[in-house]
């Protein structure tokens, strides 16, 4: 398996030329990198004007590997070839490196780049990417992979320290300014200004106190005090190391790489409508930074959010008065770590009464609104406390818990709520404090614990009786000033006290069922299943030419081909496919065919858009300006891989998928809308669907389009 690494953008608050002067001091050897034994220049080229300088070195490394492995391999040192291409005119340095030793067994490629910061020409950006592919290594492939990744990540951590070390060294030598490259023709005319600049730089070096030099200045301390400090931004919306540390926390190099790679994949497939970085990080943490697993559950969650309009729940849904009066839970300040604190007096809550009065779906929706509010409060606290806060603390008081709370429908509703929250809000619970647990609690815990993720379970702290008042209790996690009054604290807690829900508020099963349907059908999106040989099609009748058909769909599972057809004939009434084996008529499995099998393309109907292949996880928005009235058919068709793939060997994942029946099933979630010609005034912005479901978890929204003669399709 190929291991990949992608670094965030590292920002040095120094001019490019000064960074280059520091970088060159790493050769031919670097005492700060013990494994870097030495290097020899193999080839060197300089342009006549001095703007281009290309140098190729052969580097000798002493890899920290087991002695037995070195003996088996028959080598003591590993050799790499490094090619540095400096363009002083463009102020860029590109570094390419690959292994020379065991190149037929192990393939290592690295690319680094130094460029000028896009918002401050006196700052320098650094990026790094690498790949490792071990073909074979005497049966020690796994061991070599671990050693290589360990060595590489340790050197990544030292990279910034090394540059700053040589910057301090230059400072101690009085070198604080390196002039920019200029064409030879104007060098003579600018000698005077250049010399004055050097004098000014020398005077700047004198200003720095000698004591400060002895103590050693950090990179930030050495930056010019007069230099402007805009918000650190990077080209193409890339993440920089300072931003990650400030808003996301301390991550290892491999964790940073996973975040950046998953983020890049989302940008490619969702075209800017991606979740915020902290939300992506939550899914990665929930799957131990396994990119494939995190991507799978994140795509499922994004589809779920879009289908049920969860992004707008705080603005569009008001909790019923019964919840406001009898749901004994609410937000209450924050804990010692700055996490928002949610208090739930479960023992005082009439779970049976709430379920009978509201139904399971209303309770679920209320819990979702609590989680959405928690995400918002985490963002606010991150700004207030100046450090990353991505989770909240929940305090559950169980005083009053009894067998009434073990009512079977109530427990069933609780288990479903846990399942939905675990799937869509991973790593949002920082700590759960369970206080005054009664004897009946172990029974409830036995029912609930199997549905709780192991990582979440480790965050639970359970106190029986008044144990929470002793050592290791509540005071270790919450300041004394904000402990609620019902726990013998000094702070008034405005959480409702709960109590029994009056039976007059109970509703019949039919009323609750209708209410549940109403809650979860409040979505503009529809779901459909697509099978091999059984596409899903919808019919749109256009009366006036020049109308605009818009669409917005997500490919939830599998790969599909999207087509648009026009016909003057009316298709037969829509009929569900009768392939019972696929359970097409089940909820979320709608499948309809409209094009009769006897119809011929070009005679009975025509294609008005080029087929668009859409991969799993992609979000597609687009529109088509109709040329003729009649019947338009939007079709989602199963996409089969060509028999002769580009690669000689198929991927293992593809082989395994082909063995499963479900591999011939795709799922899409779509919304369509028709804009009348009188409402369309020729503006391209009018082509965008007004109901396109953009997630509020998104950090940015951009678009890219693929235009045809009369349509615009954007992914």
UniProtKB/Swiss-Prot annotation:
SUPFAM superfamilies membership: CRAL/TRIO domain, CRAL/TRIO N-terminal domain, Supernatant protein factor (SPF), C-terminal domain
Residues modified as Phosphothreonine: 234
Entry keyword Cytoplasm: yes
Keywords in alphabetical order: Cytoplasm, Golgi apparatus, Immunity, Innate immunity, Phosphoprotein, Signal transduction inhibitor
Domain annotation CRAL-TRIO: ranges: 319-495
InterPro entries hit by this protein: CRAL-TRIO_dom, CRAL-TRIO_dom_sf, CRAL/TRIO_N_dom, CRAL/TRIO_N_dom_sf, GOLD_dom, GOLD_dom_sf, PRELI/MSF1_dom, SEC14/CRAL-TRIO_domain
PRELI/MSF1 domain: residues covered: 1-175
Annotated compartments: Cytoplasm; Golgi apparatus
Pfam families, A to Z: CRAL_TRIO, CRAL_TRIO_N, PRELI
Domain of life (superkingdom): Eukaryota
Tissue-level expression: Ubiquitous.
Cytoplasm in keyword set: yes
GO cellular component terms listed in the entry, alphabetical order: cytoplasm; cytosol; Golgi apparatus; nucleoplasm
Annotated region (Required for interaction and inhibitory function toward RIGI), positions in chain: 1-510
GO MF, one example: RIG-I binding
Phosphoserine: residues bearing it: 586
Ranges of residues in domain GOLD: 521-674
Record-level GO BP terms: choline transport; innate immune response; negative regulation of cytoplasmic pattern recognition receptor signaling pathway; negative regulation of RIG-I signaling pathway
SMART domains attached to this UniProt entry: CRAL_TRIO_N, SEC14
Subunit structure: Interacts with RIGI (via tandem CARD domain); the interaction is direct. Interacts (via GOLD domain) with SLC18A3; the interaction is direct. Interacts with SLC5A7 (via GOLD domain); the interaction is direct.
Function: May play a role in innate immunity by inhibiting the antiviral RIG-I signaling pathway. In this pathway, functions as a negative regulator of RIGI, the cytoplasmic sensor of viral nucleic acids. Prevents the interaction of RIGI with MAVS/IPS1, an important step in signal propagation. May also regulate the SLC18A3 and SLC5A7 cholinergic transporters.
Protein name: SEC14-like protein 1
Originating organism: Homo sapiens
Gene giving rise to this polypeptide: SEC14L1
């Amino acid at each position: 398996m190929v291991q990949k690494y992608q670094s965030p953008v590292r920002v040095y608050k120094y001019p490019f030329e000064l960074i280059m002067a520091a970088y060159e001091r790493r050769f031919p050897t670097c005492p700060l990198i013990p494994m870097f034994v030495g290097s020899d220049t193999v080839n060197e080229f300089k342009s006549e004007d001095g703007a281009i300088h290309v140098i190729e070195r052969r580097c000798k490394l002493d890899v920290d590997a087991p002695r037995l492995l070195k003996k088996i391999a028959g080598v003591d040192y590993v050799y790499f070839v490094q090619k540095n291409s400096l363009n002083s005119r463009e102020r860029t340095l590109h570094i390419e490196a690959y292994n020379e030793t065991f190149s037929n067994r192990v393939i290592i490629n690295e690319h680094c780049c130094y460029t000028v910061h896009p918002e401050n020409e006196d700052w320098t950006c650094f990026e790094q990417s690498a790949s490792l592919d071990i073909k074979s290594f005497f049966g020690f492939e796994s061991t070599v992979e671990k050693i290589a990744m360990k060595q590489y990540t340790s050197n990544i951590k030292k990279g910034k320290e090394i540059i700053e070390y040589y910057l301090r060294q230059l400072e101690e030598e009085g070198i604080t300014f390196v002039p920019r490259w200029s064409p030879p023709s104007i060098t003579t005319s600018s000698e005077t200004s250049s010399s004055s600049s050097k004098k000014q730089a020398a005077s700047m070096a004198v200003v720095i106190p000698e004591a400060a030099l002895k103590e050693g200045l950090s990179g930030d301390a050495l930056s010019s005090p007069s230099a402007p400090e805009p918000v650190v931004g990077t080209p193409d919306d890339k993440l920089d190391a300072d931003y990650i540390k400030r808003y996301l926390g301390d991550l290892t190099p491999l964790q940073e790489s996973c975040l950046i790679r998953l983020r890049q994949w989302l940008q490619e497939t969702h075209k800017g409508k991606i979740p915020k970085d902290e939300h992506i990080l939550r899914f990665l943490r929930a799957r131990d930074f396994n990119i494939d697993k995190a991507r799978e559950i994140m795509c499922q969650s994004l589809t779920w959010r879009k289908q049920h309009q969860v992004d707008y729940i705080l603005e569009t849904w008001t909790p019923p008065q019964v919840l406001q009066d009898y749901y004994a839970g609410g937000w209450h300040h924050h804990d010692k770590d700055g996490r928002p604190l949610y208090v739930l007096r479960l023992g005082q809550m009439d779970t049976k009464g709430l379920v009978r009065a509201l139904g399971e779906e209303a309770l679920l929706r209320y819990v979702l609104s609590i989680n959405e509010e928690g995400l918002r409060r985490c963002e606010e606290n991150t700004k207030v406390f100046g450090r990353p806060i991505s989770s909240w603390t929940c305090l559950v008081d169980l005083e009053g818990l009894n067998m009434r709370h073990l009512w079977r429908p109530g427990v069933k509703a609780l288990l479903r709520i846990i399942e939905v929250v675990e799937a869509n809000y991973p790593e949002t619970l920082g700590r759960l404090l369970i206080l005054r647990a009664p004897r009946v609690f172990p029974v409830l815990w036995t029912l609930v614990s199997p549905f709780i993720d192991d990582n979440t379970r480790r965050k639970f702290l359970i106190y029986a009786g008044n144990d929470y008042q002793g050592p290791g209790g509540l005071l270790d996690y919450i300041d004394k000033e904000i402990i609620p009054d019902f726990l013998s604290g000094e702070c008034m807690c405005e959480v409702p006290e709960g109590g029994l829900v009056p039976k007059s508020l109970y509703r019949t099963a039919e009323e609750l069922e209708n209410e549940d349907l109403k809650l979860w059908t409040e979505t503009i999106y529809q779901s459909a299943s697509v099978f091999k040989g059984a596409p899903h099609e919808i019919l749109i009748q256009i009366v006036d030419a020049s109308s605009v058909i818009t669409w917005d769909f997500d490919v939830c599972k599998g790969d599909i081909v999207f087509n648009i057809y026009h016909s003057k004939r009316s298709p037969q009434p829509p009929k569900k496919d009768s392939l019972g084996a696929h359970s097409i008529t089940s909820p979320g499995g709608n499948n309809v065919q409209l094009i009769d099998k006897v119809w011929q393309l070009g005679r009975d109907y025509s294609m008005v858009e080029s087929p668009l292949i859409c991969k799993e996880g992609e979000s597609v928005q687009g529109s088509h300006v109709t040329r003729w009235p009649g019947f338009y058919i939007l079709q989602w068709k199963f996409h089969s891989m060509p028999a002769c793939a580009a690669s000689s060997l198929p991927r293992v994942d593809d082989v395994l998928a082909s063995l499963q029946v479900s591999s011939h099933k795709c799922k899409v979630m779509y919304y369509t809308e028709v804009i009348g010609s009188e409402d369309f005034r020729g503006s391209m912005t009018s082509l965008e669907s007004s109901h396109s479901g953009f997630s509020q978890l998104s950090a940015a929204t951009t678009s890219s389009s693929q235009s045809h003669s009369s349509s615009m399709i954007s992914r």
